[in-house]
């Protein structure tokens, strides 16, 4: 539900299956429950409307031709009475899918395969209306520099070898394109 959560993973075809298999295995180990219990990884969504949006996203990705790899769903029973606990889902998708272009604040991860050079991944990454946070995982310094360059990631936050979530304390925080309304914190907070 964080605005900086990873929702699209753009993976090179040479490692796609390996990454996909590792993610599917990891998701099967997630514990869902009371967020105050340190043994749990995932808490509830904010309200039942968020649950409806989550369910609609899963239905939409399938309707558009995507493939569910880790089945989602709403949990019920003891400890889940609120109706707001859902299973994190993974779906294979295309960046052109309408649902992938839409920001869903729920645990749905879209896997998108790319081929060729890192520029192709950057083009896919930049091919949405949102632009808050991005990250690249690479051992190649040139790819990292390309991602961080003026013609690379068009997000307000661009990270290398760390996730998309989080922000630097005291650093400017904000996005590009349809994301956010300017910068919060940092030196931008003093500007009028």
Residue ranges and their predicted role:
Residues 1-3:
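Extended low-complexity, polyampholyte segments enriched in Ser/Thr/Pro and acidic residues
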Residues 31, 81-192:
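Conserved C-terminal structural/oligomerization subdomain of aldehyde/semialdehyde dehydrogenase
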Residues 13-130:
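NAD(P)-dependent aldehyde/semialdehyde dehydrogenase
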């Amino acid at each position: 539900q964080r605005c900086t959560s990873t929702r699209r993973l753009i993976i090179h075809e040479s490692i796609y299956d390996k990454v996909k298999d590792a993610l599917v295995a990891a998701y099967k180990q997630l514990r869902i429950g009371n967020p105050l219990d340190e043994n749990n990884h995932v808490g509830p969504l904010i309200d039942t409307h968020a649950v409806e949006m989550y369910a609609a996203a899963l239905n939409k990705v399938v309707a558009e031709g995507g493939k569910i790899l880790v089945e989602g769903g709403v949990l019920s029973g003891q400890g889940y009475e609120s109706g707001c606990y859902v299973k994190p889902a993974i779906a294979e998708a295309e960046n052109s899918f309408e649902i992938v272009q839409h920001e869903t604040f729920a645990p749905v991860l879209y896997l998108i395969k790319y081929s060729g050079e890192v520029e192709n991944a950057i083009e896919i990454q930049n091919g949405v209306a949102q632009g808050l946070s991005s990250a690249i995982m690479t051992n190649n310094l040139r790819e990292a520099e390309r991602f961080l360059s003026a013609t690379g990631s068009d997000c307000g936050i661009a990270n290398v070898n760390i996730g998309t979530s989080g922000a630097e304390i005291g650093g400017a925080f904000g996005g590009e394109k349809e994301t956010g309304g300017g910068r919060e914190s940092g030196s931008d907070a003093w500007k009028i």
